[in-house]
Amino acid sequence: MSRRGTAEEKTAKSDPIYRNRLVNMLVNRILKHGKKSLAYQIIYRAVKKIQQKTETNPLSVLRQAIRGVTPDIAVKARRVGGSTHQVPIEIGSTQGKALAIRWLLVASRKRPGRNMAFKLSSELVDAAKGSGDAIRKKEETHRMAEANRAFAHFR
């Protein structure tokens, strides 16, 4: 039996302006080289651009985009008898949100455009509508899990 205790699960803090945990999670993922003020600037500009584009509540667009990109199931490489199988595993809500945010940021960085705020706002609006690279990544992951359903018993 292990002598070490289990780690306490940290709850995400909310950001200072919108008092929203998802915004803060997004800020922490976009952060580079410890420049948090720049990360906040990018996110808030993106939120303003979403407001201008859709003329609806930008936080509801953000929520809808993250909900749309969040995967239910993913594949994990598992070595069994000398060969590696892609084993489908269910994902919890926290891990799913983290994956969704990561995919949204990767997709927005790949986009052509002027600046990160513009690219991020475009990707979030597209994801809320059900299109874009992040949605494609989720569908690809689900297809992969479905194709490897035979290995589900290796969990």
Swiss-Prot record:
Gene Ontology annotations for the cellular component aspect, listed alphabetically:
chloroplast; small ribosomal subunit
Q: Which InterPro entries match?
A: Ribosomal_uS7, Ribosomal_uS7_bac/org-type, Ribosomal_uS7_CS, Ribosomal_uS7_dom, Ribosomal_uS7_dom_sf
Any S-S bridges, and between which cysteines?
none
Please tell me where this protein is predominantly located. plastid
**The protein's role, per its UniProt record:** One of the primary rRNA binding proteins, it binds directly to 16S rRNA where it nucleates assembly of the head domain of the 30S subunit.
- Per the similarity annotation, which family is this? Belongs to the universal ribosomal protein uS7 family.
Give the quaternary structure.
Answer: Part of the 30S ribosomal subunit.
What is the protein name stated in its UniProt record?
Small ribosomal subunit protein uS7c
Species assigned in the record = Asparagus officinalis
